[in-house]
Amino acid sequence: MRPISPQALATLLSNAGVTPESASEAMNSGGHVGSGAKQRVDPKLSRTGRGAMSPAELRVAIDKAADAAGIPNDKMVRAKWHALYRFLIEHESGNQPDRIQEVKDVNMSGAQAADGAPANAARGLCMMVPGTFGGHHVAGTSDNIYDPVANIAASMSYVMTKYHVEPNAGSNFDTFEARRHANGYTGY
């Protein structure tokens, strides 16, 4: 390997659109925007009062959640996570952040909570139950289970932990995604 002069390196990086600041940020962040660190919370149950989110609103929310959850900001990686979460959210909640579980199952239990639903009912875009949301809450996001970014980020954290899916969409990502598409849609 031949040494390169500092000026030549600076020119090379500049032509690639890399600044010393962005290179330093990437090196210090491991290539992600957020750390994806979990922060246990007692979820708030405050509905947003909004209807279904538009595709553009979902794209922004998924990107912010991916940033917080430590998903690398790589076009191919983000495209895979976006496709997965657009599909998952459409089937889980119909793109409605205030959705409460309608299917009677083991989660549909507990005393009536502040939002009128049983305490353990699944809520939000990704249909997170409060205990799972609280245990997989991503630091830096809202502690409100109905907040779109917080709900998606907690879901991503849960998927990465429970199903051993790597943030870079490597190990187990394709298997997890294929299982969601089985029979039209299979929940997680």
Question: Each predicted region: which residue ranges?
Answer:
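Composition-driven recognition of long, low-complexity, acid-poor segments enriched in small hydrophobic
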Residues: 12, 16-33, 37, 152
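Extracytoplasmic/periplasmic, Sec-exported soluble proteins
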Residues: 50-58, 73-80, 117-125, 140-151
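Short, functionally critical alpha-helical segments immediately adjacent to catalytic or ligand/cofactor-binding
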Residues: 61-64, 76-112, 149-160, 175
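Short amphipathic alpha-helical segments that mediate assembly, nucleic-acid/protein binding
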Residues: 5-9, 19-23, 55-58, 81, ...
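Substrate-binding/active-site groove segments that recognize
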Residues: 98, 102-138
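Short, compositionally biased, intrinsically disordered N-terminal export/targeting signals
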Residues: 1-12, 187-188
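Catalytic and binding regions of secreted/periplasmic enzymes and modules that target cell-wall glycans
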Residues: 123-188
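Export/targeting segments at the very N-terminus of extracytoplasmic proteins
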Residues: 31-96
